């Protein structure tokens, strides 16, 4: 019996020793993990610092580029106002002339009674069910689609540098567009966004500035995504459409 007790005690001591060894191993592993975690944390902090510095430089470069574009826009405006001929002069003259022609066309429709002022200036935008991106109609949409596309397509076809020509009201609503960008919507929202740009509302900075502009013309520039990671610099010149003394919106002309 005494021998059995001694054997049991030896077994217990051996088990405790084994457990102590395992605890030491776990503790060592934990310490190693802690040390490695500290190293990784330091590396992450260093990487984050580098990324922050890179982001700061990238933001600075973007701002300098935007400042350069803004300076270019102001230069175009100043030269046009001074009557100096530049490569942009024909586009400025074209959009101003066509904006006046569209305004006169709408005034004739009002005089004939085929269009009412309430319909022309309707700003109740009714979503078209099932469209993505969402399209809208107003009481002016039907008349716009009847009257304006032939003018818009003629303008676009007149110069290979012109990418689009479209009117937009004071809230960025485009009731009609070039035929190329007025296709029936399909199931792919990305395709729709590129090819179904009529009956849409646009609130990007360029559209907002063009829509609200009351100066004789507005010149802007921006980078247009052409897909596949390729971008091109687009110039956007617009002129206000004023009907019966009321500012309806603007005619936009985008070109490269």
Regions found by a protein language model. Give the residues of each.
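Hydrophobic interface positions of alpha-helical coiled-coils
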Residues: 2, 9, 16, 23, ...
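Surface-exposed helix-capping loop/turn segments at secondary-structure junctions
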Residues: 5, 19, 26, 108-109, ...
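Secondary-structure boundary/capping motif
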Residues: 12-13, 41, 252
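N-terminal membrane-sensor/transducer module of prokaryotic signaling receptors
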Residues: 63-256
């Amino acid at each position: 019996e005494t021998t059995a007790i001694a054997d049991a005690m030896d077994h217990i001591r051996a088990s405790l020793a084994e457990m102590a060894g395992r605890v030491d191993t776990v503790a060592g592993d934990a310490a190693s993990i802690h040390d490695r975690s500290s190293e990784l944390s330091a590396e992450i902090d260093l990487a984050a610092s580098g990324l922050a510095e890179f982001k700061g430089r990238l933001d600075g470069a973007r701002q300098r580029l935007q400042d350069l574009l803004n300076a270019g826009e102001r230069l175009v405006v100043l030269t046009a106002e001074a009557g100096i001929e530049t490569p942009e002069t024909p586009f400025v003259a074209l959009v101003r002339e066509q904006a006046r022609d569209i305004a006169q066309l709408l005034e004739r429709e009002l005089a004939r009674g085929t269009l009412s002022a309430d319909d022309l200036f309707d700003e109740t935008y009714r979503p078209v069910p099932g469209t993505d991106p969402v399209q809208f109609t107003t009481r002016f949409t039907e008349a716009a689609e009847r009257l304006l596309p032939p003018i818009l397509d003629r303008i676009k076809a007149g110069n290979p540098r012109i990418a689009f020509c479209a009117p937009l009201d004071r809230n960025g609503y485009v009731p009609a567009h070039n035929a190329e960008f007025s296709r029936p919507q399909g199931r792919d929202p990305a395709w729709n966004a590129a090819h179904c740009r009529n009956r849409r509302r646009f609130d990007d900075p360029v559209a907002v500035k063009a829509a609200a502009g009351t100066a004789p013309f507005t010149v802007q520039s921006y980078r247009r995504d052409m897909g596949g990671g390729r971008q091109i610099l687009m110039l956007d010149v617009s002129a206000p459409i004023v009907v019966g003394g009321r500012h309806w919106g603007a005619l936009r002309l985008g070109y490269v």
